[in-house]
């Protein structure tokens, strides 16, 4: 039975939704770990979010998913022992911004990170798990350049029916239009939309759709991707928060948009993948497995 005395607590790394994260040292092995401490309310017991994260994470063993080694349950706190990662994608991108203009990562690195992101997502989806909160802050990177999915605080194994999910998922900028319009029957496609937003952000060095509220978020999406109609997305007008007053924006040239933010040449193959991930109609979005088979990743096949 592991106890917290096996670990030496080092500096605090951050505060999550319901936990504080510390860097720790395993005194037995000499390896660094991340210690996620969840304070327990004596009345309430263990938060259900933490229980959900634990049961999911212990099953998920994949090189692109942060490994949960152990769970230590004491009277007033729960300590989750994760593998230690040096950085996250958000901090990594921020540290490399060209001060002249917002510029993203080199395209070879973008491709390598996106491949790893999709590998992790595909593994989740094969195991009937939605991540539901993919964003650069939740993609952890070590000094070997490995990228891994972390923070499954909102993840939930999905089954049938799937129309009971709460709409409180995914940070606004990475939130799919179907979720923003109140769809309650979403599935793996919500993670795919987030993957598309992250891919664009790695190239551009800034968020593709940086909205401040649901309405503005949808407006930004439609201004770029075009306003959906019943012709392009059957059932869109039946969604609870569909607004028939929204202007009919034409779709913009994504290639031009991306090219304006980088000195490297944006290929049609890359644009094609982004368009496949950022389909407004969730049923038209690529699956993670289809995205991994995309010609952009030919060298990895």
UniProtKB/Swiss-Prot annotation:
Gene Ontology annotations for the cellular component aspect, listed alphabetically: cellular bud neck; cytoplasm; nucleus; Pho85-Pho80 CDK-cyclin complex
Residues the record lists as binding ATP: 13-21, 36
Protein name: Negative regulator of the PHO system
Self-association and partners: Interacts with a number of cyclins.
Organism: Eremothecium gossypii (strain ATCC 10895 / CBS 109.51 / FGSC 9923 / NRRL Y-1056) (Yeast)
Pfam families, per the entry: Pkinase
GO molecular function, one term: cyclin-dependent protein serine/threonine kinase activity
Record EC number: 2.7.11.22
Keyword Glycoprotein recorded: no
Keyword Disulfide bond: no
Catalytic activity entry: L-seryl-[protein] + ATP = O-phospho-L-seryl-[protein] + ADP + H(+); L-threonyl-[protein] + ATP = O-phospho-L-threonyl-[protein] + ADP + H(+)
Record-stated family: Belongs to the protein kinase superfamily. CMGC Ser/Thr protein kinase family. CDC2/CDKX subfamily.
EC supergroup of this enzyme: transferase
């Amino acid at each position: 039975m592991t106890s917290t005395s096996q670990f030496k607590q080092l500096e605090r790394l951050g505060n999550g939704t319901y936990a504080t994260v510390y860097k720790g040292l395993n005194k037995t092995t000499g390896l660094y770990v991340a210690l996620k401490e969840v304070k327990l309310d004596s009345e309430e017991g263990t938060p259900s979010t933490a229980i959900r994260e634990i049961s999911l994470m212990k099953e998920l063993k994949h090189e692109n998913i942060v490994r949960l080694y152990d769970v230590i349950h004491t009277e007033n706190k729960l300590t989750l022992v994760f593998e230690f990662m040096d950085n996250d994608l958000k901090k990594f991108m921020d540290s490399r911004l060209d001060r002249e203009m917002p510029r993203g990562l080199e395209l070879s690195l973008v491709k390598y990170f996106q491949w790893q992101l999709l590998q992790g997502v595909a593994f989740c989806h094969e195991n009937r798990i939605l991540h539901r909160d993919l964003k650069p802050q939740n993609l952890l990177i070590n000094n070997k350049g490995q990228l891994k999915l972390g923070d499954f605080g909102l993840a939930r194994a999905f089954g049938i029916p799937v129309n009971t999910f709460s709409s409180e998922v995914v940070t606004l900028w990475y939130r799919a239009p179907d979720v923003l319009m109140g769809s309650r029957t979403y599935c793996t496609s919500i993670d795919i939309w987030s993957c598309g937003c992250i891919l664009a952000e790695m190239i551009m060095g800034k968020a593709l759709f940086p909205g401040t509220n649901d309405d503005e978020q949808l407006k930004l999406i439609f201004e770029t991707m075009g306003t959906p109609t019943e012709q392009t997305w059957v059932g869109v007008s039946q969604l609870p928060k569909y607004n028939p007053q929204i202007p009919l924006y034409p779709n913009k040239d994504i290639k031009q948009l991306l090219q304006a933010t980088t000195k490297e040449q944006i290929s049609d193959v890359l644009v094609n993948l982004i368009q496949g991930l950022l389909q407004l109609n969730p049923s038209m979005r690529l699956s993670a497995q289809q995205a991994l088979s995309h010609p952009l990743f030919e060298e990895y096949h």
